[in-house]
C-alpha cells in the first residue's frame, strides 16, 4: 500500500462517513497493479478491516476503463454489497460509469454461463477486457464457480481481485488454487503440496514456498486492523495450548449414548455429523438418524423417560435438568448472570436447531416473533428472546440483523441471543456483542476467525474498553481433566484416538493452525509498501476524504485559509489548481459532517467558507422519498 497517503492524515476521525487511510492507500496499490499493470491481486486483509469498501471503491475507479464483474457467495451478501455500493458512491467524489459494474451471486453467475451444466464458451467473450472481483475467494474452489473462474482466466487473460480474510480454509490446497488463478502459469499441485495420511499432514513444501514467492511477488496486499481500535478479548475456561477452553463434563446419560455412537462409527467420527450432534446433546434414537424429517413426524415418541418428541416438538423435564447436554447445562447456568447480547455458533442446523429451540423455551427464553418461554425471563419489562439463523431462513436474515444490530438493542432487550450455523461465518457484521459462544468446535482456523470476526471488528462497539467474552465449549468425559500444554504430546494416533471428540477436533484445529500461520507469515512478508504521490485516478477521492476530515473540526474559516490550502497542495502541487479545487467544492456545496452542526454543506459567505447545517423536511403523509442510495443503482445483465 502507499504509505505516503497514510502520512497525509493526522488523527483521522472515524466516527463520520469516511474512507479510512489504509483503504485509500490500498486503493492506490490496486489501481497501479490491476489497472496499470494488468496483474491479479490477493487482498488479504484480516476480517473487520473494510475489504468490501476497498473493493467497491476500486470497482468505481476501474469502471471508467473496463467492465467490472463482482462475485459474492450468496443473495444475502449480494444485498450487503448493493447497500455498500451506495455508501461507496457517496464517498467517491469522482466520475464513474455505473453501467460497467455488474454484481452477481455465484448462483446467478453460474446460471448466466452454463447451459445444462456445460459452460457456454461462446458467451465468455463478454468478459474480454474486464476485471473480476471475487469476495470470499477461498470458498470458490472445488465447485463450478472455481472451474468457471479458471476457464475465464485462461480464455480471457484478465486480472482478478481476490478478497479473503483467510485464504487457507482447511489445507494449503486452497492457496494452491489461488496461486493458479492469479498467475499466468499452470500449477502442478503435486509439486508444491506434500500430503500425508491425514488432512493435518497436508503441507506447503519448500518448492511450494518458492513458487508462492515467485508467482505472487507484488500481488499481495496484507493488512490487519490495529488492536487499539478493537475491544479486548477475554477467553474463558482452562488453559489449552495458546487459548482457553471450557471443559463441559458429560453426565452418565450423555456419556453412555455418546460412547455408543462413537463405537458404531469405529473411529471415523471426525468425518461424521453424528459426533457433532452427540457432543452438543444426545437424543436417544435420534443420535444416529440421518433422516430426521421422518422421526420428526413421530407422535409422543419416548427418547428418554423424561424426554419425548411429538410432531417435531421436544418436551419433558430433561430439557431443564439437561443431563442430555453438558454444554447447554453450562450455557443455561452461565447466562443467568450475564448482561448484554450473545452470539452462539453451532453446526448441523436441523439437529442443532431442534435442540436449541426447545432447551431455550423450556428454560424461560422466548423465541423472537414466536413461542413464549416457560416462566419467561424478562429485561426492561419484555421477555428475553432468541433467534436461530440457518440457511433455511435466508429471506428473513437481513430484517433479523437489523433488529439485532439496532442501537435500541445494544442491551439485548429486543433480541438477546443469536444462534447461527455456518451461514453467519462470512461477510456479516454484528454490533455490540458481549458474549461469543462456540457450541461446536470449528473445522478450521479460518472458520474460527471468521466467526469471531463477525463481532470483533472496527465500528462494532461504541465502548471498546469493555471486553468481549469468548467461550469455547468442549464436551468431555466425566473423568477427563487432562492438561493440554503442547502439541508434541499428541503426535501418536493412539494418544489422540482415546480423547473426547471435541478435544480431538481442537488438537486437529491447532495442528492445522500451525501450518496456516506459517504460510500467512510468508504472505505478510510479501505484502509491499511504498511511498509515492497518489495515483492520478484517485486524486479526487483522496481530496474528498481530506476535505471531510478538515471540515469536521472547522465550522468557519477564511476563504484563503492557509491550512486548507496547505492540505490541498499536499496532493495538488500547483497552487492555482489547488485554489480552483477549493472553488469547486465550495460552489458545488460539498457535503461534510461537522462536529458542531453534523450534516452540513459548504458555502461561501462574504470572505469566509462556512458549514451550513441542513435537514430534509417533507409534508405529512408522503408515502416515501428515496433521499439516500440505499439500493444498488448498478444493473446486472
From Swiss-Prot:
Matches recorded under InterPro entries? DNA/RNA_helicase_DEAH_CS, Helicase/UvrB_N, Helicase_ATP-bd, Helicase_C-like, P-loop_NTPase
- Where does the chain bind ATP? 45-52
Query: Annotated Gene Ontology MF terms?
Result: ATP binding; DNA binding; helicase activity; hydrolase activity
Instruction: List residues of the Helicase ATP-binding domain.
Output: 32-185
Q: What's an example GO cellular component term for this entry?
A: virion component
**UniProt domain Helicase C-terminal: residue ranges:** 327-507
Q: Where, by residue number, is the motif DEXH box?
A: 135-138
The record ties this protein, via PROSITE patterns, to: DEAH_ATP_HELICASE, HELICASE_ATP_BIND_1, HELICASE_CTER
Has the keyword Nucleotide-binding been applied to this entry?
Answer: yes
Give yes or no: UniProt keyword Ribosomal protein.
no
Main location class: virion
Listed A to Z, the keywords are: Activator, ATP-binding, DNA-binding, Helicase, Hydrolase, Late protein, Nucleotide-binding, Transcription, Transcription regulation, Virion
Report the family membership. Belongs to the helicase family. VETF subfamily.
Q: How does it assemble?
A: Heterodimer of a 70 kDa and a 82 kDa subunit. Part of the early transcription complex composed of ETF, RAP94/OPG109, and the DNA-directed RNA polymerase.
Function, as annotated, reads: Acts with RNA polymerase to initiate transcription from early gene promoters. Is recruited by the RPO-associated protein of 94 kDa RAP94/OPG109 to form the early transcription complex, which also contains the core RNA polymerase. ETF heterodimer binds to early gene promoters.
UniProt protein name? Early transcription factor 70 kDa subunit
- Originating species: Vaccinia virus (strain Copenhagen)
| Gene name of the encoded protein | OPG118
Amino acid at each position: 500500500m502507499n504509505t505516503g497517503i497514510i502520512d497525509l492524515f493526522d488523527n483521522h476521525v472515524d466516527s463520520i462517513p469516511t474512507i479510512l487511510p489504509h483503504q485509500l492507500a490500498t486503493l492506490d496499490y490496486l489501481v497501479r497493479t490491476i489497472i496499470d499493470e494488468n496483474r491479479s491481486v490477493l487482498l488479504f486483509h484480516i476480517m473487520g478491516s473494510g475489504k468490501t469498501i476497498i473493493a467497491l471503491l476500486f470497482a468505481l475507479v476501474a469502471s471508467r476503463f473496463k467492465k467490472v464483474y463482482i462475485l459474492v457467495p450468496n443473495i444475502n451478501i449480494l444485498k450487503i454489497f448493493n447497500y455498500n455500493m451506495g455508501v461507496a458512491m457517496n464517498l467517491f467524489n469522482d466520475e464513474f460509469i455505473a453501467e460497467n459494474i455488474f454484481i452477481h451471486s455465484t448462483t446467478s453467475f453460474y446460471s448466466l454461463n452454463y447451459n445444462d451444466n456445460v459452460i457456454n464458451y461462446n458467451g465468455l467473450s463478454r468478459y474480454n477486457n474486464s476485471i473480476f472481483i471475487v469476495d470470499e475467494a477461498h470458498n470458490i474452489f472445488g465447485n463450478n464457480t472455481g472451474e468457471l473462474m479458471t476457464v475465464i482466466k485462461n480464455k480471457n487473460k484478465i486480472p482478478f481481485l481476490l478478497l479473503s480474510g483467510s485464504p487457507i480454509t482447511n489445507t494449503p490446497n486452497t492457496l494452491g488454487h489461488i496461486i493458479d488463478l492469479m498467475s499466468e502459469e499452470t500449477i502442478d499441485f503435486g509439486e508444491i503440496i506434500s500430503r500425508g495420511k491425514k488432512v493435518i499432514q497436508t503441507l506447503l513444501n519448500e518448492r511450494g514456498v518458492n513458487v508462492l514467492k515467485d508467482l505472487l511477488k507484488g500481488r499481495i496486499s496484507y493488512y490487519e486492523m490495529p488492536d487499539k481500535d478493537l475491544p479486548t478479548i477475554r477467553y474463558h475456561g482452562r488453559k489449552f495450548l495458546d487459548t482457553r477452553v471450557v471443559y463441559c463434563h458429560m453426565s452418565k446419560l450423555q456419556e453412555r449414548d455418546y460412547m455408543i455412537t462413537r463405537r458404531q462409527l469405529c473411529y471415523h467420527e471426525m468425518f461424521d455429523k453424528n459426533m457433532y450432534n452427540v457432543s452438543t446433546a444426545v437424543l436417544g434414537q435420534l443420535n444416529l438418524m440421518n433422516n430426521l424429517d421422518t422421526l420428526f413426524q413421530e407422535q409422543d415418541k419416548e427418547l428418554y423417560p423424561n424426554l419425548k418428541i411429538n410432531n417435531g416438538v421436544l418436551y419433558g423435564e430433561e430439557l431443564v435438568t439437561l443431563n442430555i447436554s453438558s454444554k447447554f447445562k453450562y450455557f443455561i447456568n452461565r447466562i443467568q448472570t450475564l448482561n448484554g447480547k450473545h452470539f452462539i455458533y453451532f453446526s448441523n442446523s436441523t439437529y442443532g436447531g431442534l435442540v436449541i429451540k426447545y432447551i431455550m423455551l423450556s428454560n424461560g427464553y422466548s423465541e423472537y416473533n414466536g413461542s413464549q418461554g416457560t416462566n419467561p425471563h424478562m429485561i426492561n419489562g419484555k421477555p428475553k428472546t432468541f433467534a436461530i439463523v440457518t440457511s433455511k431462513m435466508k429471506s428473513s436474515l437481513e430484517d433479523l440483523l437489523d433488529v439485532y444490530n439496532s442501537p435500541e438493542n445494544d442491551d439485548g432487550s429486543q433480541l438477546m441471543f443469536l444462534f447461527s450455523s455456518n451461514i453467519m461465518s462470512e461477510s456479516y457484521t454484528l454490533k455490540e456483542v458481549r458474549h461469543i459462544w462456540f457450541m461446536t468446535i470449528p473445522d478450521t482456523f479460518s472458520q474460527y476467525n471468521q466467526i469471531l470476526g463477525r463481532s470483533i471488528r472496527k465500528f462494532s462497539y461504541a465502548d471498546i474498553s469493555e471486553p468481549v467474552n469468548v467461550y469455547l465449549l468442549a464436551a468431555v468425559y466425566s473423568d477427563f481433566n487432562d492438561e493440554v500444554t503442547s502439541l508434541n504430546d499428541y503426535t501418536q494416533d493412539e494418544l489422540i484416538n482415546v480423547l473426547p471428540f471435541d478435544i480431538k477436533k481442537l488438537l486437529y484445529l491447532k495442528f492445522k493452525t500451525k501450518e496456516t500461520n506459517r504460510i500467512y507469515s510468508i504472505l505478510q512478508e510479501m505484502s509491499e509498501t511504498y511511498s509515492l504521490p497518489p495515483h492520478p485516478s484517485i486524486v479526487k477521492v483522496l481530496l474528498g476524504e481530506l476535505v471531510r476530515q478538515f471540515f469536521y473540526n472547522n465550522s468557519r474559516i477564511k476563504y484563503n485559509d492557509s491550512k486548507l490550502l496547505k492540505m490541498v497542495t499536499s496532493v495538488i502541487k500547483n497552487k492555482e489548481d489547488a485554489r480552483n479545487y477549493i472553488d469547486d467544492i465550495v460552489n458545488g456545496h460539498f457535503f461534510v459532517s461537522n462536529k458542531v452542526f453534523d450534516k452540513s454543506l459548504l458555502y461561501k459567505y462574504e470572505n469566509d467558507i462556512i458549514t451550513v447545517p441542513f435537514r430534509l423536511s417533507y409534508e405529512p403523509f408522503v408515502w416515501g422519498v428515496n433521499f439516500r442510495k440505499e439500493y444498488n443503482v448498478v444493473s446486472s445483465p
